[in-house]
Swiss-Prot record:
UniProt entry keywords in alphabetical sequence: Cell membrane, Membrane, Phosphoprotein, Transmembrane, Transmembrane helix
Lineage: Eukaryota, Fungi, Dikarya, Ascomycota, Saccharomycotina
Gene: TOS2
Post-translational modification summary for this protein: Phosphorylated by CDC28.
Function: Seems to be involved in the anchoring of CDC24 to the membrane of polarized growth sites.
Disordered as annotated region, ranges: 181-233
Bias-annotated ranges (Polar residues): 181-201
Any one biological process term the GO annotation gives: negative regulation of mitotic cytokinesis
UniProt source species: Saccharomyces cerevisiae (strain ATCC 204508 / S288c) (Baker's yeast)
Pfam families reported in the protein's UniProt record: SKG6
Name this polypeptide is given: Protein TOS2
Amino acid sequence: MFSHYRYKENSCQKREAIPDKSRVSLTFLQKRTDSSNVTVAVAVAVPIGAIIIVLSVVLIVVYRRCKKEPSMQDFDPNFEGDLYYLPKMDSSMNSANSDSNATEKRFIYGGYDDFLQPSIENSQSFKDYVRRINEHAPSAYNIASLASQNNSKLSVPSKHIDLSNKISFESLENSELIVSPQHSNTGQDCDQRCDSTSNPDVNEKSSHNNDNRLKSNYTSRSGLEPQCSREEEENIDRIRSIYNIYFEKSNSTIRSSVTSSIRRDSKLNIATRKSVNMSSQDNPNDTTLIEQSHFGSTTVQEIDSSSSANEEYEDATDYLQVPAPQENKNIASSVYSEVATREKVIPESSLSLTFPPPNGLSTRITSSIYSDTVAKDHIHSAKAPVRALSEGSGQSNLTSAQQYSTYFIDHCNQSNDDNYYYNYPLPLEHPQNYENIGDLPTPTQFIYSTSSHSLTSFKGRPKPPKTLKHVPTARLNGTALNPMDHPEMFYSSPTKIPSTSLTKQFCTPLPYQLRQSVVMTNPSELSMKPRYKPAGSLRNLIKAQYLPGNSSTTTSSSLSQPPSTLSNAINFRVSGLLDDTDILQPPSVGEILPFKASTEDLRKQLGTSHNYEITPYENVHV
């Protein structure tokens, strides 16, 4: 009982204290309304001030660091940059009282050594390079001019030809050339080159000479180029040995073709000389043949003399070059040389372009494993006039750099047009004759194959159609050749199949036949009888029976009926399905929807439609 009364007293005290707290809180809120502006200002200003202070500190640090970096780079021993400036040009080149080499100094530009290159190990080498850059040394212009002069002397032979260079007509009969003493070394080099194909000892000597030549060229250039390290020299020697081995292997495969071509060319030259001799004996007064022979002999000798000078700059790749045909005696620089003032055109009957026989040896070295046989169907005989320079006042002072390429043909074979060919590139046409599937090697044999195969270039098991013209494919050791290298051996002209045979006997069209047709599919194959029944109702069947054109159902009784009874018999509905007449719209209705899209117009149109009628019979079934 006592605790119960005490609880009541405490509850009364709490209830009495509640209004006092509400009064205190109200008074407190009313007092702090005056100081709210100060708190807002402090809350905004303090963060902004802190952010400004932090940003200013960061900017000061960055500015000091950027200002400190250039000073550190100036004293950095390992810094490599564009801070070193080249010194000024030599003042002596602009002075009036200069020595005899003033013109040379004008092109030296201060005597900078363009071939002096600093190493990139440290900055000290670059500083030494800057100190030594004022030392007088041959400039790039002078070196290039000297090199161009040497090349011009080697490429263009001298215009002064001695009388010993001329070849008499008697020397043609003995097939001997009179060589001047100053070019006597040229004949020896040519003899060594011709004999090297048959004598293996000479081949070894020539290869040794090529190695010595490479070494001499390398040592001669070593004065201008920086010294190589031992590792670089070892790499160079290793590469040189690899190339020598490759050249020795290639020499063994090319010797036979080179020797045969040299022999064939020599036989042709002897035949032409004999023919010229015979014709000159028949016509002693005719000097045109003598001039032509004399003109050709001087051309041969001049090219031999120029070849000796160019031989110094040849490398070990001489063995990879196939000798050009004997008829064309024109050097590379003759295209841009001087043109003679006096010319004459040799008639077509005396000159024509020749082409090697179809069964000749291969002239391709990079892909020597393939045969370059030329089909007779793709060769057309042609003739073209060839320009030759006339000789003036009985002296042949013409050089090979001033004349066009001349062709000398045997006059005994002028009437035989089958011996003269001109290689016109003809367009290749489809279809392509593929190899048999039996020639397709196994996957393990692809590694050891000498030619690249295409898996799509093999035809399938079924035999090809008889209309295709079969061309025998070239093979090497039972391996079919690649059509990319010899397309003329794999492609032939398409055969035209008459349209009557295609209509009578159906066959699968070939890809090139599909391109010739406008329609890719045969329309006759699409005309198949339908196996489905057309959609409709019993009304369509009855209408078809009562049509006047149907003779099987038209009788005298049906024709005697009035049209009203026929229309009533046709218009009755069998089911609630829509018919064709339900879809059709009579012309009196007009548009399907009204022009004004209002609900009243739409209701009026739906209520007055002519094709919607409800009968009690249809209502029951629907």
